[in-house]
């Protein structure tokens, strides 16, 4: 009789748990990003959303709005903060001075690759995101494969050659570097690069290789430095109130999809896409893809040293020790074998 009672009680418990799961309030999360649906990051976002749907037994649906449908690329952090969207893809480098800690990632000659480098970035930035992005719920961060500088009318070999050029910088730190070299910055999100180059508003742009082809930038550029100069960090954030409104089991699902492992999964196809673009552009007639010699590369590295000093000052203003932050980043990159 005791065994029967225990069996009945177990069955009732299972039934109640199943009923509770079935009655869990379904939620649809609006996810906005600014790259076109042909971009590999979009496909990775779709796979991420499908995994969330499956893990939540259908109680969380993720609806994705690509290509700046809901707002400009520069506005995506505020869109998540203000509840215009539930999840957004943020490029912190599009807002100079606002996120100085994560700006360490933008310093030249730091990252060797975008795959393990993304797992390292996410692992490192989790220790600081709560302070720097405190008005949103941090999910994960990653980076593209290293990018370089591309020019429309002038072959640039040495930093001194940048003087007088108009450059679309990929992020805030590179913008500071270009200013120190005597160039003028022209702000434009990635989908707008071709337009500013074609109209002569800019003479050069920072971009990873595959994105050149995706946005048609190779059609208006001719000279390309064949050296990995920089990366730009990308961050996914959630609206705080929306995350707080989720049930405990739904929060668990989201937490399991906001990890360094997922950062790598999202970054990997993008990294492959970007690195593959280099050989395609190099094979095109009329394109000059040229390496930097040892002395030339040393000159570029020397020219970037003041940029680090400016970054350090911005981190001090944010109340952090820049040496500790930078050493932490370097160590994490080394742990993931992804440092320059």
Listing of model-derived features with the role each one plays in the protein:
Residues 1-9:
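Bacterial N-terminal signal peptides that target proteins for export
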Residues 17-20:
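N-terminal signal peptide c-region/cleavage motif recognized by signal peptidases
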